[in-house]
């Protein structure tokens, strides 16, 4: 029998809802899935868990006195992280604003949504397919994860991959290669 010697401790990345059949929440999640082109509700729960942890940290830091070193240091780091992700503006640099963040704010920063808003795709579902099929890159890195959270400074570097068959002068697609092969054999 083969023994596994590489044990890993995985932390939780999402939490299912406490009440599984709450009608208002289910309708709200279904609308979000349609609007943002999500595969399933697990993607919503993952982002909600991320925001819940950020809010929990902010609430803990707000209980500390203003001049506490931990509050200043960790609070500044949390605000910097949220600003870099585009969740907070430069004008909203206080821990109170982290408590008012919504899931939709984080859904707006997903690569799938940003690609659609930049006009690189025809629809939100088309954006998901382009990302999965490796037609989109961020900077010099090809990204094939639709849930990739786009930073503010990376947003201007999102474009079509030069190796994509959809780009003029890119690698030819499967049918184009087949036609070229049949023309050569004739």
Swiss-Prot record:
One of its GO terms (cellular component) is cytosolic small ribosomal subunit. Residues 174-186 have a biased composition (Basic residues). Residues 167-186 are annotated as: Disordered. Keywords: Ribonucleoprotein, Ribosomal protein, RNA-binding, rRNA-binding. Pfam families: Ribosomal_S4, S4. PROSITE patterns: RIBOSOMAL_S4, S4. InterPro entries: Ribosomal_uS4, Ribosomal_uS4_CS, Ribosomal_uS4_euk/arc, Ribosomal_uS4_N, S4_RNA-bd, S4_RNA-bd_sf. One of its GO terms (molecular function) is rRNA binding. Gene3D superfamilies: RNA-binding S4 domain. GO terms for biological process: ribosomal small subunit biogenesis; translation. The keyword Ribonucleoprotein applies. CDD domains: S4 (cd00165). This is Small ribosomal subunit protein uS4. It comes from Naegleria fowleri (Brain eating amoeba). The lineage of its organism: Eukaryota, Discoba, Heterolobosea, Tetramitia, Eutetramitia. The gene is RPS9.
């Amino acid at each position: 029998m083969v023994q596994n010697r590489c044990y890993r401790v995985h932390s939780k990345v999402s939490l299912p809802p406490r009440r599984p059949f709450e009608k208002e929440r289910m309708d709200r999640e279904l609308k979000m899935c349609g609007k943002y082109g999500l595969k399933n509700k697990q993607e919503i729960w993952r982002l909600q868990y991320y925001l819940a942890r950020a809010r929990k940290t902010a609430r803990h830091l707000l209980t500390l006195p203003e001049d506490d070193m931990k509050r200043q240091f960790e609070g500044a780091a949390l605000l910097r992280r949220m600003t870099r992700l585009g969740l907070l503006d430069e004008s909203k640099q206080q821990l109170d604003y982290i408590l008012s963040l919504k899931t939709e704010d984080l859904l707006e920063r997903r690569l799938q949504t940003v690609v659609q808003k930049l006009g690189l795709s025809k629809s939100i579902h088309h954006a998901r397919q382009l990302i999965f099929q490796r037609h989109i890159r961020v900077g010099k890195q090809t990204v094939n994860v639709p849930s990739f959270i786009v930073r503010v400074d990376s947003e201007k570097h999102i474009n079509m991959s030069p190796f994509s068959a959809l780009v003029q002068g890119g690698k030819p697609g499967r049918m184009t290669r087949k036609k070229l092969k049949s023309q050569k054999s004739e």
